[in-house]
């Protein structure tokens, strides 16, 4: 289209006119990343990576450092915001068939794995009860690896149990991984702009494009302002909304919490891990809960890209979202009936989505052929 070339030559970045609010989460994630990097840097200045001093150094940041409470709360709540945005971003990708842009989808999945690792290392740093025991449970999964598992665990811990060397390396990893996230994000954005974003209809947007600025840039700014306002409201009035009460006590290896659980954004994976009564099987399921996303570009069978015009698959998609929430809820409960059965059923349904999705695409193709 002539106007598209004119826009491109004027550096106006032509974008499809019909992209909805679901397309704003990329810029929200970029804002979250900037906030996390900035607040993380100021927290790292005052933090001490030592098992005897870590807990008191976090207390010192909150109580004595000027505006330290803002930095600490913004970093902790910002992590939750980050995951709310990223899960919505992924759900949008699944719904609108954006995974067919393979390079973008696979780089995004790699980004998610690095992000989850970074968040896990960060959760251990305050050295509270839940930090210590969550680290013990998750790192212990390495022992499930046949033959080399125990040696690998000892090497990772830097000793025969979680101790000072473990905290030091977790801090080093938590500091370095965000730079990898920034690099991968740049690659992710470059790959996206190589082909251009899709739209809710799943059609070729070249026929109707408008300049990114001012139309979409103002929309981005509005949603970012809303997100930051929400962040400040939670930080001011409900700062401990996402915190675990156990983490207000210093780590004690001799006292086990009644119910060990990670942060809410890992509960879906933790629920899947717990639903399998076998260490290696559970570890494999835990890894697959995230890695299975990489199969989506290769198992798409429908002639239609987006779910906008696929009502049968829409039902399956929303069942998948409900399943995700159910697993998250059951993971907060103790391992006892009826939660064991609910967790196992929900975990089975979670993986079943990735099998049913391509089959339904094939069925829908057949229905359309009959109608034609």
UniProtKB/Swiss-Prot annotation:
GO MF, one example: ubiquinol-cytochrome-c reductase activity
Superkingdom classification of source: Eukaryota
Binding site for heme b b562: 75, 174
Cofactor note: Binds 2 heme b groups non-covalently.
Localisation per UniProt entry: Mitochondrion inner membrane
Its membrane topology: Multi-pass membrane protein
Bilayer-spanning residue ranges: 25-45, 69-90, 105-125, 170-190, 218-238, 280-300, 312-332, 339-358
Gene3D superfamilies, sorted: Cytochrome Bc1 Complex, Chain C (1.20.810.10)
Binding-site residues for heme b b566, renumbered to this chain: 89, 188
Pfam families xref list: Cytochrom_B_C, Cytochrome_B
Residues holding a ubiquinone: 193
CDD domains the record matches: cytochrome_b_C (cd00290), Cytochrome_b_N (cd00284)
Cofactors, names only: heme b
GO biological processes: mitochondrial electron transport, ubiquinol to cytochrome c
GO cellular component terms listed in the entry, alphabetical order: mitochondrial inner membrane; respiratory chain complex III
Keywords, sorted A to Z: Electron transport, Heme, Iron, Membrane, Metal-binding, Mitochondrion, Mitochondrion inner membrane, Respiratory chain, Transmembrane, Transmembrane helix, Transport, Ubiquinone
Family: Belongs to the cytochrome b family.
Extra information: Heme 1 (or BL or b562) is low-potential and absorbs at about 562 nm, and heme 2 (or BH or b566) is high-potential and absorbs at about 566 nm.
Functional note: Component of the ubiquinol-cytochrome c reductase complex (complex III or cytochrome b-c1 complex) that is part of the mitochondrial respiratory chain. The b-c1 complex mediates electron transfer from ubiquinol to cytochrome c. Contributes to the generation of a proton gradient across the mitochondrial membrane that is then used for ATP synthesis.
Assembly, per entry: The cytochrome bc1 complex contains 3 respiratory subunits (MT-CYB, CYC1 and UQCRFS1), 2 core proteins (UQCRC1 and UQCRC2) and probably 6 low-molecular weight proteins.
The name this protein goes by in its record: Cytochrome b
Protein source organism: Pseudechis australis (Mulga snake)
Gene name, Swiss-Prot/TrEMBL: MT-CYB
């Amino acid at each position: 289209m002539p106007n598209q070339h004119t826009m491109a030559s004027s550096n106006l970045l032509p974008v499809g006119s019909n992209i909805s609010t679901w397309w704003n989460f990329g810029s929200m994630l970029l804002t979250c990343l900037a906030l996390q990097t900035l607040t993380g840097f100021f927290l790292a200045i005052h933090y001490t990576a030592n098992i005897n001093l870590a807990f008191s150094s976090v207390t010192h940041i909150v109580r004595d450092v000027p505006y330290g409470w803002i930095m600490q709360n913004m970093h902790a709540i910002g992590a939750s915001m980050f995951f709310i945005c990223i899960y919505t971003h992924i759900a949008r990708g699944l719904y609108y068939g954006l995974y067919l842009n393979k390079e973008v989808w696979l780089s995004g999945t790699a980004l998610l794995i690095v992000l989850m690792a970074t968040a896990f290392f960060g959760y251990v740093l305050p050295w509270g009860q839940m930090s210590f025991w969550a680290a013990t449970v998750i790192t212990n999964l390495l022992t499930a690896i046949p033959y080399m598992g125990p040696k690998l665990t000892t090497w990772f811990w830097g000793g025969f149990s979680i101790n000072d060397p473990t905290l030091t390396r977790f801090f080093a990893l938590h500091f370095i991984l965000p730079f990898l996230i920034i690099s991968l994000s740049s690659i992710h954005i470059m790959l996206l702009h190589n082909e251009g974003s899709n739209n809710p209809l799943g059609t070729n947007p070249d026929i109707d494009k408008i300049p990114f600025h001012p139309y979409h840039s103002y929309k981005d700014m509005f949603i970012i302002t809303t997100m930051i306002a929400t962040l400040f409201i939670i930080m001011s009035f409900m700062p401990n909304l996402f915190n675990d009460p156990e983490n207000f006590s210093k780590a004690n290896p001799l006292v086990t919490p009644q119910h060990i659980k990670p942060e809410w954004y890992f509960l879906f994976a933790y629920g899947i891990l717990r639903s399998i009564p076998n260490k290696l099987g559970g570890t494999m399921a835990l890894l697959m809960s995230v890695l299975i996303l990489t199969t989506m570009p290769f198992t798409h069978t429908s002639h239609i890209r987006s779910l906008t015009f696929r009502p049968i698959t829409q039902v399956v998609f929303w069942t998948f979202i409900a399943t995700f929430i159910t697993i998250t809820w059951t993971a907060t409960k103790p391992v006892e009936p009826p939660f064991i059965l609910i967790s196992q059923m929900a975990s089975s349904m979670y993986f079943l989505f990735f099998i049913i999705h391509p089959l339904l695409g094939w069925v829908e193709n057949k229905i359309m052929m009959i109608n034609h």
